[in-house]
Each structure stands twice: as structure tokens, then as C-alpha cells.
């Protein structure tokens, strides 16, 4: 049987809260998912690549600032330009 996974948006890291509270909340959300027996998969664009599941270093970089907010209207441009963005 496959392990359950839970998709989490990354906007809390990039636009939802100020640093370092944004990182603390995102890590707490992932831990809450783990406590329920599932694997958290925070979704973001990292340097132009779609990532489903982020490393602690990637979460820190997104939380520190400078990331865009990804949506349908700018997704192609963000990917082509190698940008990082929250979902």
C-alpha cells in the first residue's frame, strides 16, 4: 500500500506571513501532516523547476524573500526565467 501524501501550498512561505514566522508555520504544517501518518509535499517553483516536496534549505530560501507568486498567467514565464515562486 502506498503511503498517503498531502499537498501543501507554499504561499505561506512566500507571501502569507513575515519571516521567520512564515518558515515556522510551514514547518509546523508539515509536522502536523506527519503526525497524522502522511507525507507532506509542499509545492513551489525553485529556480525554474516545479518541486513537489521541498528540502529544508529550499523552504528557508523561499521564506527569506524575493520569490514571486505563481499563477496560471505567469507560470510559463517563471519557468522560462528560472525564477522561484510560491503556489
Question: Which residues are covered by each model-predicted region?
Answer:
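Glycine-rich nucleotide/cofactor/substrate-binding loop typically near the N-terminus or early
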Residues: 10, 23-78
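Generic N-terminal amphipathic, Lys/Arg-enriched alpha-helix
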Residues: 4-17
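Generic structural signal for well-ordered, non-membrane alpha-helical segments
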Residues: 18-26, 85-87
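N-terminal glycine-rich phosphate/adenylate-binding segment common to multiple enzyme folds
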Residues: 77-87
